[in-house]
């Protein structure tokens, strides 16, 4: 009994060590998150994808806001990526409802490491957005690393 427990513990420790040593990889999709708080952080990180190219990993690509919880602040935070920055167009609405997004999500903050909108959304429309992160010092018009997401009022 003790021997099996020890072998199981050793196997679990070995798997944990392997998982910790693997480099960060870009995720194809992430789980949706429900945001019922006054502040909803979304972590953004530059990582290497399976081919070795730089890509964005975003903690949540679908943000579900409680329909009666307007006034929350959605904040994208650039983490662990000192060679990259947010710029004026780093979180941009796109798709069918892009034209009405500015009224539903007024801009709160733009900095090199944070980008935030206030949620005033009171309808059931889906708002698609694109996150863009730029290499620091790159000229205007440079190609950013891009990730897509959606914000929707949902239970």
Region annotations inferred by a language model:
Residues 1-11:
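Bacterial N-terminal signal peptides that target proteins for export
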Residues 20-26:
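Sec/Tat signal peptide C-region and signal peptidase I cleavage site
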Residues 31-70:
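N-terminal edge beta-strand
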Residues 43, 73-77, 128-130:
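Beta-strand secondary-structure signal
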Residues 64-82:
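Beta-strand cores of secreted/periplasmic/IMS beta-sandwich domains, seen most often
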Residues 83-103:
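Short, surface-exposed alpha-helix to beta-strand junction/turn motifs within ectodomains of secreted
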Residues 105-155:
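Extracellular/periplasmic metallocenter environments
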């Amino acid at each position: 009994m003790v021997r099996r427990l020890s072998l199981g513990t050793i196997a679990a420790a070995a798997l944990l060590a392997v998982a910790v040593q693997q480099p960060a990889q870009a995720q194809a999709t992430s789980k949706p998150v429900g945001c019922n708080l006054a502040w909803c952080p979304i972590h953004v990180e530059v990582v290497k994808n399976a081919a070795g190219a730089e890509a964005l990993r975003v903690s949540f690509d679908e943000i579900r806001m409680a329909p009666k919880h307007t006034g929350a602040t959605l904040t994208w935070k650039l983490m662990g990526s000192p060679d990259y920055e947010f710029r004026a167009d780093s979180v941009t609405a796109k798709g069918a409802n892009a034209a009405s997004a500015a009224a539903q999500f007024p801009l709160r903050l733009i900095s090199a490491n944070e980008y935030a909108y206030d949620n005033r959304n009171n309808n059931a429309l889906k708002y698609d957005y694109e996150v863009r992160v730029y290499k620091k010092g790159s000229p205007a018009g440079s190609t950013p690393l891009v990730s897509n997401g959606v914000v929707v009022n949902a239970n």
